[in-house]
């Protein structure tokens, strides 16, 4: 059983609200979950403390058990100082058209 810490959408249409949950990766996004760890309200101001609430003790416990955080939850854990998020290796950006034509000899 692959366990994931992820966001489950709640709220109404046009008013998103997310619960931070531990769930089996095979369960639907908004379906069954094992435990609720907190919430995230994206409509609040970014500097508002009530925008994100996590039970960090439970999060650390699940990470120790092998749960993998989703990309967004990994960002939250990085800002909370629980777990360092690895930087992604972005591919090189495309070469501008002028340089491409000059390299082709046209």
UniProtKB/Swiss-Prot annotation:
GO biological process: translation
Pfam families in the record: Ribosomal_S16
TM segment ranges: none
Organism, as annotated: Rhodopseudomonas palustris (strain ATCC BAA-98 / CGA009)
Species classification: Bacteria, Pseudomonadati, Pseudomonadota, Alphaproteobacteria, Hyphomicrobiales
Gene Ontology cellular-component annotations: cytoplasm; small ribosomal subunit
Keywords noted in UniProt: Ribonucleoprotein, Ribosomal protein
HAMAP family, per database record: Ribosomal_bS16
Annotated GO MF terms: structural constituent of ribosome
Gene name of this polypeptide: rpsP
UniProt-listed InterPro entries: Ribosomal_bS16, Ribosomal_bS16_dom_sf
Protein name as catalogued: Small ribosomal subunit protein bS16
Family: Belongs to the bacterial ribosomal protein bS16 family.
Annotated spans, Disordered: 84-106
């Amino acid at each position: 059983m692959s366990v994931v810490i992820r966001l489950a959408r709640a709220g109404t249409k046009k008013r998103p609200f997310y619960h931070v949950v531990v769930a089996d990766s095979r369960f639907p996004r908004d379906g069954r979950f094992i435990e609720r760890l907190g919430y995230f309200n994206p409509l609040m101001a970014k500097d508002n403390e009530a925008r994100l609430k996590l039970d960090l003790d439970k999060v650390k416990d699940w990470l120790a058990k092998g749960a993998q955080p989703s990309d967004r939850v990994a960002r939250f854990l990085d800002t909370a100082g629980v777990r360092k998020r690895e930087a992604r290796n972005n591919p090189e950006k495309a070469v501008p058209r002028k340089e491409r034509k000059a390299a082709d000899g046209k």
